[in-house]
Structure formats: structure tokens, C-alpha cells
Amino acid sequence: MRVADFSFELPESLIAHYPQAERSGCRLLSLDGPTGDLTHGVFTDLLEKLNPGDLLVFNNTRVIPARLFGRKVSGGKLEVLVERVLDDHRILAHVRASKAPKPGTELLLGDDESVKATMVARHDALFELHFDDSRDVLSILNDIGHMPLPPYIDRPDEDADRELYQTVYSQRPGAVAAPTAGLHFDEPMLAALRAKGIEMAFVTLHVGAGTFQPVRVDTIEDHIMHAEYAEVPQDVVDAVLACKARGNRVIAVGTTSVRSLESAAQASQDAPIAPFFGDTKIFIYPGYHYRIIDALVTNFHLPESTLIMLVSAFAGYQNTMSAYREAVAEQYRFFSYGDAMFITHSPMAEQEKVG
């Protein structure tokens, strides 16, 4: 399967650089998987598309201010992007510098260069850094870090991004990118969903910087996914099984919720799904057999990205690419701060030919 099959033309003007004034004020393109039919609307239309007893599964990760600027004590400037917090004093990070720091290199981090750190070891493309500070890592990042806006949002981060690039239900710090489908849910929307009898459950997947890495191979099967830490606790498993038993739908809010639930299903030995705590490298592309998800809320994804492949595996390749062409023609806003889709599963997607 060719990566190029997932390309589409996207005018630069359709990339959203700022969010909507109201979280739930975005547009919603609904794609009916079985028929391929498209419906244009607004995000609050989602209320009418869900039935009492349906289960929405959210990702409650919280974005950390993971981008740091500074220099080596010896002089060279550098930029640090945290990939993972290892413990209270150590991180794994991407480091951009004219010359990669060697083990033992001392760093001065923060806009005022007030925080000392040491490069301890290199692990492939990532650097292990130790903060020489009495505060824990998250406190340091909150004090000196910048919000890690995606590379396609071509502007410096602003103070407002600390909350805007964050879901209202985020609880577990550790992500370096927001689970962006969740950005559209505000408190009134969540209250309206509860009032209608929609069930809710929360997984955790700490989105890594690898989510923005382009696919660098020509053939999809050759791509190796980055690892991300995910948790699907027992209460989520119970909610999913109860939802299925009563004949309702499991609806994932975002591709990270999809990947968490499907990882838990893959790891389960004898039940449809079991609790999951650990790294996942699940790569979902056409031909994948979905085990848990019946519908999906998601944003519009980058051309040739693993996420448009995931959507194609769910809704069908032709359905997905047609929907994206329609979204471009109708000038929907794309990517993290953009508009949303509501998609139901196509039973034919698994067998469909790509290209």
C-alpha cells in the first residue's frame, strides 16, 4: 500500500492557526460509513446523532509546556522538546542544536537561562536530560516551558494557548500534543450529553512528539510507529462491555482514544477487551479489523499521515478521500485548531482496495 495514495491538495489558507471563539462553535462534517453520505452541520449537532446509552470515550491526558529554549554552558543555542517525563528529575527529549550535546554536557534552560540540566545519555534520536534543581520536572516545565504547538501552527505560543490547547476535562499531565477532537467539547456540551443519557469514560494516552513526524517511507507496511504510553483502566473496560451488551455504540473521541481502546482489545487474551497499561505502537491502516469502535469524532488530518490512514481503515478509503475533497471544497478548517468530523464505521472498509 502506497503512502502517496493518502495525499490530497490542501490550501495553506485552510490550516487553522487559532481556535474558534467557542469550543463547540466549529463546523461538523458527518460521514456515514455504510453509504458514504456526507452531511454538513455544526458541532452541537452531535447531540442529535447520539442515542441514550451510547458511550463516549475521551482521552484525559493533559498537555505539558514541553518546549524549552536555552543553550549549552559552552555557548551553543538549543531547543528541547520533551517526549516523555521519566521521573521527578529526568526527561527524554528531542534536542535541536547546531551540534548534538554529548553525555555530560551542561545546559542552561529557560528564556532567562535559570535552570541547569545535564545531558546524561542518548537513546537513538532521543536525549536523556537530568534537571539539577530541587523542583520536580512538571513544576519546572510549568515555570519555564512553552506550549508545544504543532509545527503547522506557524506562530509562537501565547499565554492563552495554555488553556485553549487543552481539553476542559484534561487531568493527567504528560502529553506534548493535545488530543484535538476533544477540544470541541465545552462544559455546556458535556452537560447536555449527560442530560441525554450519554455515558462517558476516560482513557489516557500521552501523545508524543512522534505524532507530528512525517511518514518517511513509500510503502505503508514499512513504517514503524513511535511508542506512546496508554492506560485503559477496568472501569473503561466495564463501560465498553456494558455498552455492547445493551446494543449501544462505543464512540471514540479522537484517534488517541481509538488507539487506546484497540490496543486494549489486541492485548486481551479471551475477552473482547481487557485493562491495558503500557506502551502502544499500534498502527491502524486499511485492512485493519476494528474490534471495539462503532463511531468516531475526529479532526481533519494531514495528507499522508498515519491518522488519515486510521480514518480510512474505519470509514473506507474512497469514503474518506471523498470526504476530505468535499471538506477542502467547502473550506472547512484543518488540523489541531480546526473543524471536526463524526464518522460511523463502514463494514466494507476492511476489504476495500486502496488507490
From Swiss-Prot:
Coiled coil: none annotated. Keywords: Cytoplasm, Queuosine biosynthesis, S-adenosyl-L-methionine, Transferase. Transmembrane segments: none annotated. The keyword Cytoplasm applies. One of its GO terms (biological process) is queuosine biosynthetic process. One of its GO terms (molecular function) is S-adenosylmethionine:tRNA ribosyltransferase-isomerase activity. It catalyses: 7-aminomethyl-7-carbaguanosine(34) in tRNA + S-adenosyl-L-methionine = epoxyqueuosine(34) in tRNA + adenine + L-methionine + 2 H(+). Pfam families: Queuosine_synth. It comes from the Bacteria. Pathway: tRNA modification; tRNA-queuosine biosynthesis. It is an enzyme of class 2 (transferase). It is found in: Cytoplasm. Its EC number is 2.4.99.17. One of its GO terms (cellular component) is cytoplasm. Monomer. Belongs to the QueA family. Transfers and isomerizes the ribose moiety from AdoMet to the 7-aminomethyl group of 7-deazaguanine (preQ1-tRNA) to give epoxyqueuosine (oQ-tRNA). PANTHER family: S-ADENOSYLMETHIONINE:TRNA RIBOSYLTRANSFERASE-ISOMERASE. This is S-adenosylmethionine:tRNA ribosyltransferase-isomerase. It comes from Pectobacterium atrosepticum (strain SCRI 1043 / ATCC BAA-672) (Erwinia carotovora subsp. atroseptica).
